[in-house]
Amino acid sequence: SDYSIWKYLEGTKEASDPSTAWRALDFDDARWREGQSGFSIGFGNYDAPTRLWGMPRVYPSLFLRKKFTLEDTGWIQSLVMRVDYDDGFVAYLNGTEVARRGLAGEPDQPVPFDAPAAVHSRGNPELIDLAPYKLLLEAGENILTVQAHNSTVLSSWFAFHVELLANVVRGPFISATT
């Protein structure tokens, strides 16, 4: 849903060792915090549900995890990630990189927790077509993980909100006539 509960970890260091382990479905995130989707420092005009008051001058990034269950993936026609962000992010679906904005590197190249993002202002959500990645989805449990970054640890502007949207089509349907 639009404002579902996510697990998150403040980016004061790498989220795991090795640095990519946190992206896995079976990663133990029991010590991570929980917050409603829509994360921000709380300054400016973005009234996000989860406020990160301690972020400025302390940590430059945020690690996010959201598990979700699908009964059947065969009916999914389209898959779109709607994301509004300030400043950059990398998103992974079931451990595979599916989108990167404002952060240097090649696909699936790990991004250090303290990497600066290019400056980008929120307010114009981007729709990213993930149809090429819908085969990554499995019947049962799946996970969307995101590493969201600020432009600098000193910046007092940070915001991140994401939704994964699927168009499900069932049919064709045949009705019996009497």
Question: PLM features: residue spans?
Answer:
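An acidic-aromatic loop/edge-strand motif
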Residues: 104, 114-178
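Boundary/junction segments of secreted and surface-exposed precursor proteins
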Residues: 1-13, 168-178
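Short edge-strand/loop segments of extracellular domains
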Residues: 84-89, 96-98, 162-171
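Surface-exposed, low-complexity/disordered Ser/Thr/Gly/Pro/Asn-rich loops and linkers
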Residues: 25-65
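Aromatic-lined ligand-binding clefts that engage carbohydrates, nucleic acids, or primary amines
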Residues: 6, 32, 60, 68, ...
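Extracellular and analogous surface-interaction loops
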Residues: 65-75, 132-136
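Acidic glycine-/aspartate-rich tracts in secreted/extracellular proteins
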Residues: 9-16, 26, 38-40, 72-74, ...
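Extracellular/periplasmic catalytic domains that process cell-envelope and extracellular macromolecules
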Residues: 1, 74, 84, 136-139
